[in-house]
A protein has these predicted regions:
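Domain-terminus/edge residues, biased toward the C-terminal soluble/receptor-binding domains
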Residues: 4, 8, 13-253
């Protein structure tokens, strides 16, 4: 499950139906999955696709419609790597775009916008995040005392091998970092340990800043911490979440 909560799809063509709806967050969650499939990203960047003529049909050429991916277009955006356009008279213009500036990968969703505004709105949103937020790898910072080592997405991929889904290489989503405003320090981030597997000694660390989720990391925990869990010195609920001081690890990162 991707975690969407406000969508219901009743057709595959996207045409209007009162029972066919979604929201920006759910579309962003769907768009985030594209990062898992490099082959799909490659397809999205094609400038056109041609279906050759046959005995029964003429040649059909399908051009790229996402203007941020067309170098000759005034709306071209150098960091855009994939996306999908949409329009109905009821929904107006919609646009989902994926961008990568070499440091941060983002998904932007713009809904119910008039066509002339959809590309500049998307670019402005991307530029705001790229210019005002920072991506901090947690492995480069001081580890929480409970953590033995962090497990990166590349580690998971090497251990599991390259899974194949529908003929496309599948890659785990990158984690192990936090996204913070540039004027905020990593030491101001709080964390909570969840989903601990006592057999493997692995689990997830959820990071928050000012009550907002800012990232997560997969980690292998110390024997001392695992012993605390098994002996009940740390209160852990059925989901494997450490509950301290009101349900949250009180220590700063």
């Amino acid at each position: 499950s991707l975690g969407g909560e406000n969508s219901n799809f009743v057709n595959a063509n996207g045409l209007h139906d009162d029972n066919h709806y979604t929201c920006a967050r759910d579309m962003a969650l769907i768009g985030r999955e594209i990062w898992r499939y490099p082959e799909f990203l490659k397809i999205c960047q094609e400038q056109s696709y041609t279906i050759p003529a046959s005995d029964t049909t003429e040649e059909h050429v399908f051009p790229q419609h996402h203007k941020m991916l067309i170098k000759e277009n005034k709306n071209y955006y150098q960091y855009a790597v994939a996306g999908k356009t949409g329009y109905t008279s009821n929904a107006l213009s919609t646009l989902i775009t994926m961008a990568d500036n070499g440091n941060m990968k983002l998904v932007c969703v713009v809904l119910r916008t008039h066509g002339a505004n959809i590309y500049p709105d998307t670019k402005n949103l991307f530029e705001y995040v790229f210019n005002n937020f920072q991506k901090i790898p947690v492995a480069d910072e001081k580890k929480p005392t409970e953590v033995k080592e962090f497990i990166t997405a590349s580690d998971e991929s090497e251990n599991a091998g390259s899974a194949q889904t529908g003929g496309n290489e599948y890659q785990p989503l990158e984690d192990g970092y936090v996204i913070l405003p540039k004027d905020v320090s990593y030491k101001d981030v709080d964390y909570e340990i969840t989903d601990v597997d006592e057999k493997t000694g692995e689990g997830t660390i959820q990071y928050t800043y000012d009550g907002h989720s800012v990232g997560s990391a997969t980690a292998k925990f110390t024997e001392k911490y695992l012993q605390k869990i098994s002996t009940g010195k740390e209160c852990v609920d059925n989901s494997g979440t450490t509950k301290n001081s009101g349900g949250k690890s009180s220590a700063k990162s």
